[in-house]
């Protein structure tokens, strides 16, 4: 399990090492604060690893567990200085793949926008489908995420807000009772 988690979080671990090295070198208080704000990456590593542990132990991940991951990450984004709100509707169980895909998409958006992120709204609805919608105010274009998430939909409005959506089919074996 440890090797699997290390492999899957290798990019974020490398980013964290680079940030810590830069933090040790900087003498600028504003830059140090900015670097410290990037504990978002550390939270992602911790929470994603936890999703894998829970998923392996229980065979599925509850929507509540995913909610806890996103809420903690959202709190860190607020500390970082951006507005952030997470809304998750629905209950039941998700596969490990579904839960990590949701969390990975969230993290990919945050990592892409980290330097310019002003606001992020995350909305997830779990029913027959797992529907993910993110509204992002930041300077970096997110359309490039489609290479990593092929079924991703992206658009940008005239005010520069970006909308990222993805729809995942729920696996029958982990649907909550009464949702079949």
Where are these regions (language model features)?
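Conserved short strand/loop->alpha-helix "switch" segment adjacent to the catalytic nucleotide/phosphoryl-transfer site
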Residues: 1, 80-110, 128-131
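Flexible, glycine-/charge-rich segments associated with ATP-binding catalytic modules
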Residues: 146-180
